[in-house]
């Protein structure tokens, strides 16, 4: 009875949303701009829990859902929309690039670093932020490994072709 309840996904999905840093706003500046489409990611997580989605599929869709859908993104099936929505995971970190009065290059760099931090703490249980500047003192993460990981994400989080949060639907 409890597993069949729609509240099951809300209850247990909330734990994942906490780990993913889910927020309805950017969480960066005093203005704290609203993330207009963040609810879609929240609903994706709740549905995934209610539908008993396998964990490997859950993680794959969040990290690479856009790579699982063929271009162009027109006349999308419900499955394709789900996969694209799942990539909202990569945009849950604080992002100040839509705020006025901030250095955009610094804000973009911080948004990427925060996204890496969310991804690594939630999926591998390690903090890697220290490795931005030096080899991690306690975990086996070198500075070189950190920037290798960042290079993997570069196509999805291109700081030179950055879209402000208000220009995104994910």
Task: Locate the predicted segments by residue.
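Short, structured secondary-structure elements
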Residues: 1-170
């Amino acid at each position: 009875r409890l597993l069949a309840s729609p509240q099951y996904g809300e209850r247990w999905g909330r734990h994942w949303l906490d780990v993913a840093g889910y927020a309805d706003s950017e969480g960066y500046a005093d203005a704290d701009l609203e993330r207009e489409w963040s609810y879609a990611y929240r609903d994706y997580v709740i549905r995934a829990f209610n539908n008993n989605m396998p964990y490997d599929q859950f993680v794959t869709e969040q990290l690479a859902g856009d790579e699982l859908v063929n271009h162009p993104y027109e006349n999308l099936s419900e499955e394709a929309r789900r996969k694209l929505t799942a990539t909202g995971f990569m945009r849950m970190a604080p992002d100040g690039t839509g705020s006025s009065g901030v250095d955009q290059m610094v804000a973009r760099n911080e948004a990427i670093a925060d996204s890496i931090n969310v991804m690594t703490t939630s999926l591998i249980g390690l903090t890697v932020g220290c490795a931005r500047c030096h080899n991690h003192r306690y975990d086996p993460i070198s500075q070189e490994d950190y920037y290798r990981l960042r290079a993997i994400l570069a196509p999805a989080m291109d700081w030179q072709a950055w879209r402000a949060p208000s220009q995104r639907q994910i």
